Amino acid sequence: MGKGVGRDKYEPAAVSEHGDKKKAKKERDMDELKKEVSMDDHKLSLDELHRKYGTDLSRGLTTARAAEILARDGPNALTPPPTTPEWVKFCRQLFGGFSMLLWIGAVLCFLAYGIQAATEEEPQNDNLYLGVVLSAVVIITGCFSYYQEAKSSKIMESFKNMVPQQALVIRNGEKMSINAEEVVVGDLVEVKGGDRIPADLRIISANGCKVDNSSLTGESEPQTRSPDFTNENPLETRNIAFFSTNCVEGTARGIVVYTGDRTVMGRIATLASGLEGGQTPIAAEIEHFIHIITGVAVFLGVSFFILSLILEYTWLEAVIFLIGIIVANVPEGLLATVTVCLTLTAKRMARKNCLVKNLEAVETLGSTSTICSDKTGTLTQNRMTVAHMWFDNQIHEADTTENQSGVSFDKTSATWLALSRIAGLCNRAVFQANQDNLPILKRAVAGDASESALLKCIEVCCGSVKEMRERYTKIVEIPFNSTNKYQLSIHKNANAGEPRHLLVMKGAPERILDRCSSILIHGKEQPLDEELKDAFQNAYLELGGLGERVLGFCHLLLPDEQFPEGFQFDTDDVNFPVDNLCFVGLISMIDPPRAAVPDAVGKCRSAGIKVIMVTGDHPITAKAIAKGVGIISEGNETVEDIAARLNIPVSQVNPRDARACVVHGSDLKDMTPEQLDDILKYHTEIVFARTSPQQKLIIVEGCQRQGAIVAVTGDGVNDSPALKKADIGVAMGIAGSDVSKQAADMILLDDNFASIVTGVEEGRLIFDNLKKSIAYTLTSNIPEITPFLIFIIANIPLPLGTVTILCIDLGTDMVPAISLAYEQAESDIMKRQPRNPQTDKLVNERLISMAYGQIGMIQALGGFFTYFVIMAENGFLPNHLLGIRVTWDDRWINDVEDSYGQQWTYEQRKIVEFTCHTAFFVSIVVVQWADLVICKTRRNSVFQQGMKNKILIFGLFEETALAAFLSYCPGMGVALRMYPLKPTWWFCAFPYSLLIFVYDEVRKLIIRRRPGGWVEKETYY
């Protein structure tokens, strides 16, 4: 059994040992997969097939031969995509990005504690506490993120259906049903309507067989399958049926030519799993932010390390200072804050029908600048619907809305009654059983898409089709075939005063018209003259130009004298007229746009997002839907439109004059990357029609070359490579295939394009709110770190301890920081351009300068003011404190004098110092009130925004209550060395809090009054 030419290109190559070779090979494989499908089995005659596969075309393989091939090729199943082991996922959460910074902090703390323990007799435990707490923070937030991701992957698992699929094969001349996984190359397989195709088949005989290829090629119409070789392209030819597509009607028999990963579907799945998803924008932002923070921390640490050596501290003390400064700079609570903010948004999106698989995808959607959307089922309803009728020489519009709230037409015309009768009788579609309580449009139908559309339309307009069919019982029928291009049936006519037999026919309009000599107008038969033929032609062109699928309908009342009751009609040797019929009308169908889509596309446009339609459907249909949903907006022309308007050949039009553009897949095949870039750059509204899955991938890569952040929507297997390659892949939850759901980052549970726009809005909002959260959290770093610096430089007793810093970062600041995630959008965020990931960072210099250089400095002043007030009240005036540190911290000196000559023992001094730590801590809480309120907005006044955020108000109360609890709770003096404060000491920082609020309101006022001015350039983060 020789291997065919096509086969060799499918064989997955062996994996090479060396890293570089491996990488080069992977790239080569990807390029190979991006090429179009190549196979030659569709060109072979039956004899050649028999020789190539050694299969008897009537008896099939022998069981023994099948077992040999199964052992050689392996089971007929797709290799599951490589999954990441759970422990690796967990480690990623524990050691990725921000966590790494905290781990380094923890290690440094243990190091400092080790140095102190080795050099001092009674070391302080601060650094030990700090190290333990930091480690705990990382582990807890790591577990939290891991749990969140595991939860969404559980939902993913539940999507997979566990029913093993069966296939009917012929072996040793006997039909047997086996597991589809056991099907081998060369097997003779039978399929019937409702079956899933078990492998790639070369059809050798068929009877009215149609398959639904939409998951593979994106065509919404069922495609006929027959033994005829009709097209060079294996995806277009009729004699190949593809693995995992569905047979919708008829029967067929075929030989298996490819199984498992070597099938066309298998190649696409391999293509998807071989693609590397890039880093998400938010991950890049957090990395950039860590670089900034680490940079600042190390710079400060090293500067003060050198400074303390110059100030003649011992190098051990200097190392302790270095570590202290670096740790004080790490915002311990931020990791948890970011995780919680993303989780909250993911939950909010799930309520709006967007299931996010990994948290970071939440924000990616917000920075999207291009959406490549599939047409069928995403932009459209994925159900063929009657859109227009042409009868009585005029076009009538049908109601295509999802809830039947649209237009209606005159249903009393005698011609309409005749037309609806033909559409109901000359129709094999039937409603499935037990659905009487469902609305008509929601009922499931057995039959092809066009006939289902006619059935539903007639049922809605004229009542029960079943009763109509019972009244006019069917006698004989000629089913639709590709040579005649019509379907005909003859029925008993129960109407009194009319002949006993009614012949009804439907089919391709031009073929039907050729068989007619008269036409029904207002219920009266008229001869079909040239004028009426022109009217027909115009109507046909108009409906076809709307991208609709048009069918013609005609009938004939068969005269009783020729066809008496009981006449034997013969469909093989036709003994009844099929010419000189009476033309009744046209009905056209379309898969109509979803109701919410035009509005969603409009929102995308005002948000600066380019929506590109990519579909396997016909260019005319694609263009019509694109116009219907606003992807091509009114007044925008394609090159062809301009040529038609100016009456010149297309070649004379400058392509850059056209805003819109419809690109055919076959043209895309021959384009260089530069030509594709040209199209993507110079046309604002683009439709790609008749595209293959590989081309979808090329389009996504083209958009990414332009620097766009690309979201791709799709439901078919054919979309999975593009879903994986895109910055964010969006799969359909209802119609989506398993492969596409695995490749995507987000799943639309209601399959509605409008949900994506909701997602974009949420993504932009979370980016804004994360900025605010970070600005709020970072500000308190300055009042936390300056006490340490002044302690080193001015040699004063330490104003704020390590434990109190932790109480701020992991205690009082947490809830307020998270509450900012609930803040509403301050301006219309869907009216601005998508952010540019190169320039518009989550944390930029302006944010750092605001948090550290301005607000943070005011906060530090507030803290020091409180510190000096308490020291002075206890007898130590500021000038007396300078240079006192060494004697102050010496536990053997018990007679340190204050400004009034009073002597203090070591224990007494420490109680004053720790009271100062507590007061400094409370002052930071007081100034953080103002900081939280000003962080609510970046441009608007707080008075415009209002205080509607209930969580934020709770946050203010929570941080105050926690501060009071830590200060006044009995036993805190022992546990955390925090002491009760006089009520007046709480008020020391109030003026500074007010100053922060006023300062920032004035700054925002100037920004609003002078947009683009110096203040905005320097301080708008």
Swiss-Prot record:
Name of the molecule in the record: Sodium/potassium-transporting ATPase subunit alpha-1
Topology Extracellular: residue spans: 107-129, 307-318, 791-800, 865-916, 969-983
Membrane topology note: Multi-pass membrane protein
PTM-bearing positions, type N6-acetyllysine: 9, 21
NCBIfam families reported in the protein's UniProt record: ATPase-IIC_X-K, ATPase_P-type
Subcellular location per the Swiss-Prot or TrEMBL entry: Cell membrane; Basolateral cell membrane; Cell membrane, Sarcolemma; Cell projection, Axon
Region (Mediates interaction with SCN7A): 594-715
Principal location listed in the UniProt entry: membrane
